[in-house]
């Protein structure tokens, strides 16, 4: 009406200026348009900026920065903010890039410039890292100065294909009687260590590293096994204690420690296992043997879940992203035994998973069990009873390790696992206190002593030639009449007796890796004589 009245009066209607129109549109902008408005304003501010190579921070918080620009960026490329903080591009979306920060997000401000580095996350590798403690990006954190190495490898690379691999056929000895006899591990295998918190999972891994000392200070390069220990989400005091233990036992010289502790940003905890694997792969690809321990992958999965949810990726079971299986499979598939044409190197993986209340059927445990070649299941109940390592013989299995087991061990421990499983069953039944026949009593007597024989103190790994006579004595009933409280004493005295008087037999087992008929007869008479004198 107002416009018509003006027209009749011959007066032109007032025009709303474009600026006013834009202001009106912005005032009524929907939340989805806010980003494009911000982009326009940033373009206005930095008209000359090259948005292909640089960008500006739109928003930052919870360790995630959303950046406008960086049009040429690659997935998982390193970027650097003007404040000096580094990050990694994980989400490449239309109009913006989701970047996870490797430092504190308090240092990053909105509108700050971000630059491409041009390189996917890569880490230093090679023998120069042995004896060092590094962070998830390979930077030294032990105060021993910079790492002088000419080799750098991408942290995330494809696993070896099918043809370059060969089947697991060499033993990887842990020095633990319960593991080497019941769930043997071979070079190139992935053996999961799973159990509740405080059940001795890390200790099995540490003892395995300590046991490599007997070969790593020798001359035979093929027998050496270089160790990489990846600490994810652990307390700094725990990592410091581990370094101290390895130094005390002279094992740090052939080990690399990658630490992404609980106080580090989630992206670093996610990246650390890949960094450690790249370092282990250098040894594998150069015809050497390497062992990597992931302690633990549950915390890596939690860090990845945190990042994914903050990046607005859709959640799945237990709020983990849909590709959490791929996260662990692409990591563990990099452990392999290479064929002779590829140099014959190997990378053995010991991933650790922490369960809640013994629930092995949770999402992450079942994922990793299906990826690995077997698992060592540790039970809190056994641990509290003083049976350490607290390995549940019934649930623990090694799917490929038996092909790599030392022949002498296979000869003496063949029936051990089945017998211990029978003992557990009978022991549970015997609790009801019913009358037992002679054979059941015999099973209980021998089973109790065998269980004690498999116990072992921390940081005291044994060689296979020391284990074989002990397990032979236990399986064949030579210690059935020895009192339960005397089993530990028998073990110590028998081993020292063999070293003092029968060192030729031990050397022969160590050299050949098997028990000949002659040596078997010899071992039988030695054991009978020693048990007879010990009982007196």
Curated annotation (Swiss-Prot):
GO biological process: proton motive force-driven ATP synthesis
CDD domains, A to Z: ATP-synt_F1_alpha_C (cd18113), ATP-synt_F1_alpha_N (cd18116), F1-ATPase_alpha_CD (cd01132)
Chief site of localization: mitochondrion
UniProt GO cellular component terms: mitochondrial inner membrane; proton-transporting ATP synthase complex
Domain of life assignment: Eukaryota
Alphabetized UniProt keyword annotations: ATP synthesis, ATP-binding, CF(1), Hydrogen ion transport, Ion transport, Membrane, Mitochondrion, Mitochondrion inner membrane, Nucleotide-binding, Transit peptide, Transport
Pfam family of the protein (one): ATP-synt_ab_C
Transit peptide, residue positions per record: 1-24
SUPFAM superfamilies given in the database record: C-terminal domain of alpha and beta subunits of F1 ATP synthase (SSF47917), N-terminal domain of alpha and beta subunits of F1 ATP synthase (SSF50615), P-loop containing nucleoside triphosphate hydrolases (SSF52540)
Subcellular location: Mitochondrion inner membrane
Gene Ontology MF terms in the entry: ADP binding; ATP binding; proton-transporting ATP synthase activity, rotational mechanism
Membrane topology: Peripheral membrane protein
HAMAP family per UniProt: ATP_synth_alpha_bact
PANTHER family: ATP SYNTHASE SUBUNIT ALPHA, MITOCHONDRIAL
SUBUNIT field: F-type ATP synthases have 2 components, the catalytic core F(1) and the membrane-embedded component F(0), linked together by a central stalk and a peripheral stalk. The central stalk, also called rotor shaft, is often seen as part of F(1). The peripheral stalk is seen as part of F(0). F(0) contains the membrane channel next to the rotor. F-type ATP synthases form dimers but each monomer functions independently in ATP generation.
General function of this protein: Mitochondrial membrane ATP synthase (F(1)F(0) ATP synthase or Complex V) produces ATP from ADP in the presence of a proton gradient across the membrane which is generated by electron transport complexes of the respiratory chain. F-type ATP synthases consist of two structural domains, F(1) - containing the extramembraneous catalytic core, and F(0) - containing the membrane proton channel, linked together by a central stalk and a peripheral stalk.
Entry similarity comment: Belongs to the ATPase alpha/beta chains family.
NCBIfam families xrefs: atpA (TIGR00962), PRK13343.1 (NF009884)
Protein name: ATP synthase subunit alpha, mitochondrial
């Amino acid at each position: 009406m107002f416009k018509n009245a003006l027209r009749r009066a011959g007066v032109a209607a007032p025009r709303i200026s474009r600026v006013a129109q834009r202001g009106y549109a912005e005032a009524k902008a929907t939340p989805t348009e806010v980003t494009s408005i911000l982009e326009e304003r940033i373009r206005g501010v930095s008209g000359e900026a090259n948005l292909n190579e640089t960008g500006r921070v739109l928003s930052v918080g919870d360790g995630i920065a959303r950046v406008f620009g960086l049009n040429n960026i690659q997935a998982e490329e390193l970027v650097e903010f003007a404040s000096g903080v580094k990050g990694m591009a994980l989400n490449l979306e239309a109009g913006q890039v989701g970047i996870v920060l490797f430092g504190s997000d308090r240092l990053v401000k909105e509108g700050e410039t971000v630059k491409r580095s041009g390189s996917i996350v890569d880490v230093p590798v090679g023998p120069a890292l042995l004896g060092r403690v590094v962070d998830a990006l390979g930077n030294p954190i032990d105060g021993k100065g910079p790492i002088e190495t000419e080799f750098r490898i991408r942290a995330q690379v494809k696993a070896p294909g099918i043809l370059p691999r060969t089947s697991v056929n060499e033993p990887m000895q842990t020095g633990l009687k319960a593991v080497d006899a019941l769930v043997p591990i071979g070079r190139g295998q992935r053996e999961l260590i799973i159990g509740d918190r405080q059940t001795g999972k890390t200790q099995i891994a540490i003892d395995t590293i300590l046991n490599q000392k007997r070969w790593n200070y020798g001359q035979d390069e093929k027998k050496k096994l270089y160790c990489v220990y990846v600490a994810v989400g652990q307390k700094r005091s725990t990592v410091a204690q581990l370094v101290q233990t390895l130094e005390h036992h002279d094992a740090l010289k052939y080990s690399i420690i990658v630490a992404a502790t609980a106080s580090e940003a989630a992206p670093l905890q996610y990246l650390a296992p890949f960094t450690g694997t790249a370092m282990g792969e250098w040894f594998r690809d150069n015809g050497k043997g390497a062992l990597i321990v992931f302690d633990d992958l549950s915390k890596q999965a939690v860090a990845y879940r945190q990042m994914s949810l903050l990046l607005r990726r859709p959640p799945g079971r237990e709020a983990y992203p849909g590709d959490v299986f791929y996260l662990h499979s692409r990591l563990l598939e990099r452990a392999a035994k290479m064929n002779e044409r590829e140099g014959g190197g190997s990378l053995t993986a010991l991933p650790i998973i922490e369960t809640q209340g013994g629930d092995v059927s949770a999402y992450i445990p079942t994922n990793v069990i299906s990826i690995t070649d077997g698992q060592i299941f540790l039970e809190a109940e056994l641990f509290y009873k003083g049976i350490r390592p607290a390995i549940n013989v019934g649930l623990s299995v090694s799917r490929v390790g038996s092909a790599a087991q030392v022949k002498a061990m296979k000869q003496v421990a063949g029936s051990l696992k089945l017998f211990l499983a029978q003992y557990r069953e009978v022991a549970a039944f015997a609790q009801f206190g019913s009358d037992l026949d002679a054979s059941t009593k015999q099973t209980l007597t021998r089973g109790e002593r065998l269980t004690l024989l498999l116990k072992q103190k921390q940081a005291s790994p044994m060689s296979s030639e020391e284990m074989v006579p002990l397990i032979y004595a236990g399986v064949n009933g030579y210690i059935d009449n020895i009192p339960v409280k005397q089993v530990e004493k028998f073990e110590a005295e028998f081993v020292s007796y063999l070293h003092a008087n029968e060192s030729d037999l031990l050397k022969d087992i160590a050299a050949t890796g098997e028990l000949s008929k002659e040596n078997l007869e010899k071992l039988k008479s030695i054991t009978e004589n020693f048990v007879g004198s010990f009982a007196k």
